[in-house]
């Protein structure tokens, strides 16, 4: 069984004048990327929120200095993939806003990220997208979605409490696992 990589493709919406420092875009990028890493789709709160997330230059500014402050070249991302990509400018890196990542990546039954296409496999390897931490975070999010649904149903059907208890226990186990894999 496989799962879709993400449900929402980020959309860059900034249309104002180019800023002098790309860091000034961080709040807008966080919003445009739905507070998720553009490459792993993990929510930024698992990494400490917007404060600790980074801004990647799809085309590295060390090699393309004219794109350093170009909003269309910026990707909101976690530090792990930003460091893994570094200043690599291989054309196989796919812009998370211009490509449907569901066509290039999938999650296996455990939530681990895998590439489907040549570009997806390249990125998964280069950016270490198969790290267990990303699967754990995805599973936590899936559990939270299910828990929220059950909590709504429980208002009318309290006999479902054992199911909620089981999901909360799994959620707790994943949180413990995430702490171990930091």
Language-model segments: what does each one mean?
Residues 34, 75:
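Residues immediately within or flanking Cys/His clusters that coordinate Zn2+
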Residues 29-32, 38:
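Aromatic-lined ligand-binding clefts that engage carbohydrates, nucleic acids, or primary amines
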Residues 1-14, 22-28, 44-48, 65-73, ...:
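Extended charged
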Residues 55, 73-74:
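A basic- and aromatic-enriched beta-loop-alpha substructure that forms the phosphate/nucleotide-
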Residues 37-40, 78:
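Short cysteine-rich clusters marking metal-coordination/redox-active sites
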Residues 54-61:
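Histidine-centered catalytic micro-motifs used for acid/base chemistry in nuclease
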């Amino acid at each position: 069984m496989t799962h879709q990589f993400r449900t929402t493709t980020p959309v860059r919406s900034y249309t104002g004048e180019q800023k002098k420092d790309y860091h000034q875009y961080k709040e807008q990028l966080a919003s445009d990327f739905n507070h998720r890493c553009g490459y792993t789709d993990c929510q930024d709160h698992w990494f400490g929120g917007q404060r600790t997330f980074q801004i990647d230059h799809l085309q590295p500014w060390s090699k393309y200095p004219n794109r350093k402050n170009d909003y269309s070249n910026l990707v909101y991302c976690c530090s792990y993939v930003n460091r893994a990509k570094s200043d690599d400018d291989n054309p196989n890196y796919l812009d998370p806003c211009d490509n449907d990542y569901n066509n290039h990546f999938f999650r296996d039954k455990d939530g681990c990220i895998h590439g489907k296409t040549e570009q997806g496999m390249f990125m998964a390897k280069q950016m270490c997208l198969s790290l267990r931490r990303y699967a754990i975070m995805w599973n936590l999010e899936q559990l939270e979605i299910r828990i929220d649904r059950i909590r709504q149903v429980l208002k009318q059907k309290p006999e479902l409490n054992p199911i909620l208890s089981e999901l909360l226990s799994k959620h707790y186990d994943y949180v413990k696992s995430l702490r171990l894999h930091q």
